[in-house]
Amino acid sequence: MVSTSNGSDPLTIGGRLFSCRLLTGTGKYPSINSMQSSIERSACEMVTVAVRRVQTGAAGHTGLMEAIDWSRIWMLPNTAGCTNAEEAIRVARLGRELAKLAGQEDNNFIKLEVIPDSRHLLPDPIGTLQAAEALVKEGFTVLPYINADPLLAQRLEEVGCATVMPLGSPIGSGQGLNNAANIALIIENATVPVVVDAGIGVPSEAAQAMEMGADAVLVNSAIALAGDPPSMAEAMGKAVIAGRMAYSSGRLPRRGQASASSPTTGLISGKDK
């Protein structure tokens, strides 16, 4: 199992502290056992659960609630499958009840997804903002999934969201950080944690997001659909730790020309022979 990140550098969301900055999902795994092992080896402390799929017993979600140790893992219910704000609000309420059934009575977290387009799976900015405003008023800790739109991120922060979760690229695409420039702007301006969500395909991309200054990443498809999900989960966990350490250490400034790493004084010249 990967050791979690430095305990002196916790991730704080909604007043709750997490020592691991990798969030994972529960969908698309080849088996429940594969999911369990992946969660364990990633060292993650928060996993997202699709409320609708658990409620309906969708493929891959039967027995999910019993398969995870909810005394150790914080549940992040999500509103996947919701196409408008009204649906998302209803499913968020069900998600809160689901967390209570898992023994997390004080869990008001919700990963807000409003996605009307089933082909491209891009989030609806207007519906997301509408649902976020309503859910914050109901006492939810809202983690909204959004396009990498700096202005929308700012507005969601203003209405009281606990994080913003810009996508790197479309869900499940494995295209990496196609929106790196906008994500960098969001990170620069945000006063809440920025969690890069969707599109990460390999550990180097998770590390890249962390090196940019993201507070965390959420990775599901890249782990669940890997040839060896538990090994990929461990690799992602290590990449997130490395990326965070690199960001905290401060990178070498970029220069327009070379700079010798060896001293240029005291060199032996031809005259010294």
Curated annotation (Swiss-Prot):
InterPro entries: Aldolase_TIM, Thiazole_synthase_ThiG, ThiG. Its main location: cytoplasm. It catalyses: [ThiS sulfur-carrier protein]-C-terminal-Gly-aminoethanethioate + 2-iminoacetate + 1-deoxy-D-xylulose 5-phosphate = [ThiS sulfur-carrier protein]-C-terminal Gly-Gly + 2-[(2R,5Z)-2-carboxy-4-methylthiazol-5(2H)-ylidene]ethyl phosphate + 2 H2O + H(+). It is found in: Cytoplasm. Its EC number is 2.8.1.10. SUPFAM superfamilies: ThiG-like. One of its GO terms (molecular function) is thiazole synthase activity. 1-deoxy-D-xylulose 5-phosphate binds at G172, A198, G199, N220, S221. HAMAP family: ThiG. Catalyzes the rearrangement of 1-deoxy-D-xylulose 5-phosphate (DXP) to produce the thiazole phosphate moiety of thiamine. Sulfur is provided by the thiocarboxylate moiety of the carrier protein ThiS. In vitro, sulfur can be provided by H(2)S. This is Thiazole synthase. The gene is thiG.
